[in-house]
Curated annotation (Swiss-Prot):
Chain segments carrying region RNA-binding and homodimerization: 1-73
Residue span of region CPSF4-binding: 180-215
Record-given protein name: Non-structural protein 1
Gene: NS
Self-association and partners: Homodimer. Interacts with host TRIM25 (via coiled coil); this interaction specifically inhibits TRIM25 multimerization and TRIM25-mediated RIGI CARD ubiquitination. Interacts with human EIF2AK2/PKR, CPSF4, IVNS1ABP and PABPN1.
Annotated keywords: Eukaryotic host gene expression shutoff by virus, Host cytoplasm, Host gene expression shutoff by virus, Host mRNA suppression by virus, Host nucleus, Host-virus interaction, Inhibition of host innate immune response by virus, Inhibition of host interferon signaling pathway by virus, Inhibition of host PKR by virus, Inhibition of host pre-mRNA processing by virus, Inhibition of host RIG-I by virus, Inhibition of host RLR pathway by virus, Interferon antiviral system evasion, RNA-binding, Ubl conjugation, Viral immunoevasion
GO molecular function: protein serine/threonine kinase inhibitor activity; RNA binding
Example GO BP: symbiont-mediated suppression of host PKR/eIFalpha signaling
Pfam families cross-referenced by the UniProt entry: Flu_NS1 (PF00600)
Motif Nuclear localization signal: positions: 34-38
Entry-linked HAMAP family: INFV_NS1
Role noted for this protein: Inhibits post-transcriptional processing of cellular pre-mRNA, by binding and inhibiting two cellular proteins that are required for the 3'-end processing of cellular pre-mRNAs: the 30 kDa cleavage and polyadenylation specificity factor/CPSF4 and the poly(A)-binding protein 2/PABPN1. In turn, unprocessed 3' end pre-mRNAs accumulate in the host nucleus and are no longer exported to the cytoplasm. Cellular protein synthesis is thereby shut off very early after virus infection.
Lineage: Viruses, Riboviria, Orthornavirae, Negarnaviricota, Polyploviricotina
């Protein structure tokens, strides 16, 4: 096993412990608490994959961080913080929408790389919008926290979430997963649209005038491609 993989996991465990203490003292905002819950699932998955105990890893991670802090000067810390790119957390969904339980009459699930796609194939002839909470860096989607598909009535009928056992995904991974979800929902004559925020940062427009990321012709072509992909890769339980 790569020692860097182990040390990275150990440090992540300790940093999660620190963030949990912050949350316990009611010092974390909604995005902070949201990431805390998601990262907990991710760490459990990584620990299972690596065969490492989280409690032991947390203690070792603390030692690693303490050693680094002893060697770190205040000036070096300032320089590091100044040079690091800052990411932003964007929210289409409220905490209630993110944490709400939902049920499927005809559940279908597909794993696409590091992302899990779930949808209810019993939903037909509905107008659906995709909303997501995610982080952005350099004006591009960096990390998807959670994406959900909502009907006009507010019912949840689909979801894309990162797999805890496979941390890390790219902007292309997210776009591909969205394409599969849209294709699956449109197969039952649903009308699907993507929120403006998600569309802006997942599909960056190359037009300087700020036009839409896809022309109507491009959208029709993408829809045909998606449907073809769905036929080849039917979503399985």
């Amino acid at each position: 096993m790569d020692p860097n993989t182990v040390s990275s996991f150990q440090v992540d465990c300790f940093l999660w412990h620190v963030r949990k203490r912050v949350a316990d003292q009611e010092l974390g905002d909604a995005p902070f608490l949201d990431r805390l819950r998601r990262d907990q699932k991710s760490l459990k998955g990584r620990g299972s994959t690596l065969g490492l105990n989280i409690e032991t890893a947390t203690r070792v991670g603390k030692q690693i961080v303490e050693r680094i802090l002893k060697e770190e000067s205040d000036e070096a810390l300032k320089m590091t913080m100044a040079s690091a790119p800052a990411s932003r957390y964007l929210t289409d969904m409220t905490i209630e929408e993110m944490s709400r339980d939902w049920f499927m009459l005809m559940p279908k699930q597909k794993v696409a790389g590091p992302l899990c796609i779930r949808m209810d194939q019993a939903v037909m002839d509905k107008s659906i919008i995709l909303k997501a909470n995610f982080s952005v860096i350099f004006d591009r989607l960096e990390t998807l926290i959670l994406l959900r598909a909502f009907t006009e009535e507010g019912a949840i009928v689909g979801e894309i979430s990162p797999l805890p056992s496979l941390p890390g995904h790219t902007n292309e991974d997210v776009k591909n997963a969205i394409g599969v979800l849209i294709g699956g929902l449109e197969w039952n004559d649903n009308t699907v649209r993507v929120s403006k925020t998600l569309q802006r940062f997942a599909w960056r427009s190359s037009n300087e005038n700020g036009g839409p990321p896809l022309t109507p012709k491009q959208k029709r072509k993408m829809a045909r491609t998606i449907r073809s992909e769905v036929r080849r890769n039917k979503m399985v339980d």
